[in-house]
Amino acid sequence: MTTITLVQGDITRQHADALVNAANSSLLGGGGVDGAIHRRGGPAILAECRALRASRYGEGLPTGRAVATTAGDLDARWVIHTVGPVWSSTEDRSDLLASCYRESLRLAGELGARTVAFPALSTGVYRWPMGDAARIAVETVRTTPTAVEEVRFVLFDTHAYDTFARELGDAGHAGHAGHPG
């Protein structure tokens, strides 16, 4: 069974086999987690992303899909880039958000990753409500068969951490670590 833990902090400072990047479809960096991973990871990540764009994803990486690159200068073996959906009040896109977690876990398993660190996907500029995002993330990780031993949600602020902690507590699998207090 996969252990789920929470950490409040900067995902680019985590040690894990794979760090998940909340990428945009261009794979060329951006703001938030995406920009931070590209900045701290260095040029090797961008070079591999450019190669992926040139060879397989000329139109960009589709929402809900995941691809892996080197982790560059990050303390990880791989970065798994996934494109989350933009929140919509008129269309249910939760299956796409769940797909980001499932596809990232599938890819991590194929790579042989045992520890995977996720941010709260789609909750930044894509405006997904934190409570719903936490529910989808925790439920998807709990129900997705995987060889990954630890999934660590790395949450940038207290609001995100507390929301995920409530969701984990409600799910009966409270495994918390690293909350500043």
UniProtKB/Swiss-Prot annotation:
InterPro entries: Macro_dom (IPR002589), Macro_dom-like (IPR043472). Gene3D superfamilies: Leucine Aminopeptidase, subunit E, domain 1. Residues 1-172 form the Macro domain. Disulfide bonds: none annotated. NCBIfam families: PRK00431.1-6. Belongs to the MacroD-type family. This is Macro domain-containing protein in sno 5'region. It comes from Streptomyces nogalater.
